[in-house]
């Protein structure tokens, strides 16, 4: 199936009601159907291919991609696909400063690791019941917010965002730090400052699944390429 047909099947072309549009998205809109803007997939297809290729190249060069999707219908998909390709993710709440104040975030990640170790080795059980419950609640709270980035090990090389409007703080932080931004931008979104714009439906589960599967597949393919390059380098070193 062609990419265009896959997008049509996933409903990528359905935008928002005309009343909610952002005029900056005008060039990506094909028309209006029953008061809803229809996105021009002839524009989306090459832009999406560019974004997927960029993600693949970044990973092939040893880079990390941070997937961000905190809206209800994106949470499970973002988490599942990020885990499938071994990349960090934020799927519940974007903490202000998650990128721009990463030093502080890293301290919280260390705290989470310490508490998890205490739970595993039984240290928590030696505390009073009240202390143990407090620490368990802290683990749950930190895991929910930081669980997806606890193995990130530093700032990402790029972020992939499901909804440019919803995740505007994440985008602003990435821009401040010169981290490349890939974002799904619906007809109500502001495409300004986004490095790789993907005009498309950012609400439908089917559309979100389509994007995330393609990105995760690109990461997995690139990881194979990366390992092949490493293996060749090892062979050359041993020769």
From Swiss-Prot:
GO MF, one example:
structural constituent of ribosome
The reply on keyword rRNA processing is: no
Q: Which GO terms describe its cellular component?
A: cytosolic small ribosomal subunit
List all disulphide bridges recorded for this chain. Answer: none
PROSITE patterns for this protein:
RIBOSOMAL_S2_1
Q: Which SUPFAM superfamilies does the record associate with it?
A: Ribosomal protein S2
Which positions are tagged coiled coil? none
Going by the UniProt record, its keywords in alphabetical order are: Ribonucleoprotein, Ribosomal protein
GO terms of biological process kind = translation
The family database entries (Pfam families) matched by this protein are listed as:
Ribosomal_S2
According to its UniProt record, which protein family does this protein belong to? Answer: Belongs to the universal ribosomal protein uS2 family.
Query: HAMAP family attached here?
Result: Ribosomal_uS2_B (MF_00291_B)
Q: Which PANTHER family match?
A: 30S RIBOSOMAL PROTEIN S2 PROKARYOTIC AND ORGANELLAR, SMALL RIBOSOMAL SUBUNIT PROTEIN US2M
**Protein name as catalogued:** Small ribosomal subunit protein uS2
Species: Francisella tularensis subsp. holarctica (strain LVS)
